[in-house]
């Protein structure tokens, strides 16, 4: 995706998919949405994959999913890379792509199985329904989780430990330097 120059994982996925009979169009690194869209329209893929190694790539993937959704696409989108996770995909990504399905693929060795599940006309609906149910469950757990109320920075600063002569002496009185 745009902003990410890392390509090792993407390259491994491409090789694994090609070795298993899939036709792959590898767009390279630093790929913006317009290039992705142009290739979707030209190549007519069954599945789209996005990969990212750095944290800003997650926001770029979310933006791409939102645009794909707005543009009316419903292609399955595979998400992978070091910064991605099942929870992040369910909580932050999937809600931006309501017309399609977003699948977190944590390892290149799993991509062929996921693609076969998604492309199997007899079982893909069940696979997608189960995946979306799992993502909805993850989202529900997230929304119901205990919220941490952080203290405002000014309040935290006002409660900082204040050193003075008495508390310094109390802290050091049992510490014998001569031993």
Name each model feature, range by range.
Residues 66, 70, 94-99, 116-124, ...:
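Generic secondary-structure signature for well-ordered alpha-helical cores
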Residues 107-179:
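Active-site loops and adjacent core secondary-structure elements that bind or stabilize anionic groups
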Residues 100-107:
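Short acidic-hydrophobic, aromatic-tinged amphipathic segments that line or gate anion-handling sites
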